[in-house]
Amino acid sequence: MFNVVLVEPEIPPNTGNVIRLCANTGARLHLIEPLGFPLDDAKMRRAGLDYHEYAQMRVHRDWDAFVAAEAPDPARMFAFTTRGSGRFHDRAFEPGDWFVFGAETRGLAPALVDRFAPEQRVRLPMRPGNRSLNLSNTVAVVVFEAWRQAGFEGGA
């Protein structure tokens, strides 16, 4: 299935929503520290309801530890950023792909975005003049589009 990577998430309910999304779609969740909250935060647990036990989640101390532990294929990693030049719906996603998202208030650090090839820097369309979409909403749109492309494999 797909991999969701949240780099330094800050808002507990967003991460809770993503946990629930991953449990319901079979996506694996990777959290890159530092986190803006403790993992037992009540707001995060409430947003994720009782789905925590069904989600596959790993926590990594930083980006380099994540890359060392998971060894993702750079060609199958996609950085979702408002500074991306490619549109997500023009991509052909494959099971096993890695979808990387930044912190709610600042997105992905420019130095991290620079590690991705330009064609791997992707954005969702928005109306002009808006800054960004909510993190958990963006993750849901991306995961469901990728899962749709995979024929909703494993879904009921």
Swiss-Prot record:
<dbReference type="InterPro" id="IPR029028">
    <property type="entry name" value="Alpha/beta_knot_MTases"/>
</dbReference>
<dbReference type="Pfam" id="PF00588">
    <property type="entry name" value="SpoU_methylase"/>
</dbReference>
<dbReference type="GO" id="GO:0141098">
    <property type="term" value="F:tRNA (cytidine(34)-2'-O)-methyltransferase activity"/>
</dbReference>
<dbReference type="GO" id="GO:0002132">
    <property type="term" value="P:wobble position uridine ribose methylation"/>
</dbReference>
<dbReference type="InterPro" id="IPR016914">
    <property type="entry name" value="TrmL"/>
</dbReference>
<keyword id="KW-0808">Transferase</keyword>
<keyword id="KW-0819">tRNA processing</keyword>
<keyword id="KW-0489">Methyltransferase</keyword>
<comment type="function">
    <text>Methylates the ribose at the nucleotide 34 wobble position in the two leucyl isoacceptors tRNA(Leu)(CmAA) and tRNA(Leu)(cmnm5UmAA). Catalyzes the methyl transfer from S-adenosyl-L-methionine to the 2'-OH of the wobble nucleotide.</text>
</comment>
<protein>
    <recommendedName>
        <fullName>tRNA (cytidine(34)-2'-O)-methyltransferase</fullName>
        <ecNumber>2.1.1.207</ecNumber>
    </recommendedName>
</protein>
<dbReference type="GO" id="GO:0003723">
    <property type="term" value="F:RNA binding"/>
</dbReference>
<feature type="binding site">
    <location>
        <position position="124"/>
    </location>
    <ligand>
        <name>S-adenosyl-L-methionine</name>
    </ligand>
</feature>
<feature type="binding site">
    <location>
        <position position="102"/>
    </location>
    <ligand>
        <name>S-adenosyl-L-methionine</name>
    </ligand>
</feature>
<keyword id="KW-0949">S-adenosyl-L-methionine</keyword>
<comment type="subunit">
    <text>Homodimer.</text>
</comment>
<dbReference type="GO" id="GO:0141102">
    <property type="term" value="F:tRNA (5-carboxymethylaminomethyluridine(34)-2'-O)-methyltransferase activity"/>
</dbReference>
<dbReference type="GO" id="GO:0002131">
    <property type="term" value="P:wobble position cytosine ribose methylation"/>
</dbReference>
<dbReference type="InterPro" id="IPR029026">
    <property type="entry name" value="tRNA_m1G_MTases_N"/>
</dbReference>
<dbReference type="GO" id="GO:0005737">
    <property type="term" value="C:cytoplasm"/>
</dbReference>
<comment type="similarity">
    <text>Belongs to the class IV-like SAM-binding methyltransferase superfamily. RNA methyltransferase TrmH family. TrmL subfamily.</text>
</comment>
<keyword id="KW-0963">Cytoplasm</keyword>
<feature type="binding site">
    <location>
        <position position="132"/>
    </location>
    <ligand>
        <name>S-adenosyl-L-methionine</name>
    </ligand>
</feature>
<dbReference type="InterPro" id="IPR001537">
    <property type="entry name" value="SpoU_MeTrfase"/>
</dbReference>
